[in-house]
Amino acid sequence: MKREQLYSGKAKTIYRTDDPDTLIAEFRNSLTAFNGEKKGEMELKGYYNAQISKKIFEMLEASGVKTHFVSMLTDIDMLVREVEIIKIEVIVRNIAAGSITRKYPIKEGTILKPPVLVFDFKSDEYGDPMLNDDIALALGIATREELAELRKLALRVNELLVPYLDEKGILLPDFKLEFGRREGEIVLADEISCDTCRFWDKKTGQSMDKDVFRFDKGDISKAYEEVARRIVPEIFE
C-alpha cells in the first residue's frame, strides 16, 4: 500500500494511500506537553495508544457512534477514513482536574454533574484558546447546527465511555475529542488514548495518562501499560 506523508503532528504521522478515501495514521512514541515545550520518547507508547484507540473506537461504533476508524494495518498503523477536520477541540469534564481548577474556584476531585463541556480553538499558533459559539461562528469554523451536533456527540461518547472504563477500574476525569465532516455527517476522528484523556485509577486516584509525563509523577511507561492491560488485555497474551 502506498504511503505518502501528508503531515506529521505531535504524536502521529498521517499518510495518503492508494485509496483517495482513506489515510494511514501512524502512532509514534513521541511525548509532548505544554504545547510542545516539553518533549520525550517512550518505547511502545505508539503501540499502546493505537491499540487503546482501536478498542474504544470499536466499542463506540458498536453503540452507534460513527468514527473514522477502518482497521489496523500494523500494531501502530491505523487505516482511517479521510475527514475534513473541524478546528475545534471538544473537552468533556466529569471530575475537576487540571486547568479548570486553576482558572476557577473549583477544587480538584469535585464531581461535575452535569459534565462540563468546553470548546477550544484547535490552533497551536494561538495556544488553543477557549471558544464560545459566537467566536466559533465569527471564525467560520462551524455552523450553529454543527456546534449543537458536536455537543450531542461528545456527551454521547461520554455516556458510553464512563461506564465502560469504570468496569475496568478506571475513572475518566476529562478527555478531548476531535471531529470531522464526512459525506454530510460529523464523525469522531483523531484518537482516544492516554494522550487525550485523563485516566485515574479507581482505587488509588493515581494518574495513568500523560499527566505522569507532564508533571513528572512517576514511570510513564508503566502508566500507559497499565491502561492498555485493562482495556486491551488480549495484546499481552
Swiss-Prot record:
**Residues making up the signal peptide according to the UniProt record:** none
* Pathway, per record: Purine metabolism; IMP biosynthesis via de novo pathway; 5-amino-1-(5-phospho-D-ribosyl)imidazole-4-carboxamide from 5-amino-1-(5-phospho-D-ribosyl)imidazole-4-carboxylate: step 1/2
The catalytic activity, as recorded, is: 5-amino-1-(5-phospho-D-ribosyl)imidazole-4-carboxylate + L-aspartate + ATP = (2S)-2-[5-amino-1-(5-phospho-beta-D-ribosyl)imidazole-4-carboxamido]succinate + ADP + phosphate + 2 H(+)
Q: Which GO terms describe its biological process?
A: 'de novo' IMP biosynthetic process; cobalamin biosynthetic process
Q: What EC number(s) is this enzyme filed under?
A: 6.3.2.6
Tell me which domain of life the UniProt entry assigns to the organism this sequence originates from. Archaea
User: Which key words tag this protein in UniProt?
Assistant: ATP-binding, Ligase, Nucleotide-binding, Purine biosynthesis
**Does this entry carry the keyword Ligase?**
yes
**Enzyme type, top EC level:** ligase
Pfam families associated with the record: SAICAR_synt (PF01259)
Q: Which GO terms describe its molecular function?
A: ATP binding; phosphoribosylaminoimidazolesuccinocarboxamide synthase activity
Q: Which InterPro entries match?
A: SAICAR_synt/ADE2_N, SAICAR_synt_PurC, SAICAR_synth, SAICAR_synthetase, SAICAR_synthetase_CS
- Indicate the family of this protein: Belongs to the SAICAR synthetase family.
The record's HAMAP family line, in alphabetical order, gives: SAICAR_synth
Name recorded for this polypeptide = Phosphoribosylaminoimidazole-succinocarboxamide synthase
What is the scientific name of the source organism?
Methanosarcina mazei (strain ATCC BAA-159 / DSM 3647 / Goe1 / Go1 / JCM 11833 / OCM 88) (Methanosarcina frisia)
Q: Which gene encodes it?
A: purC
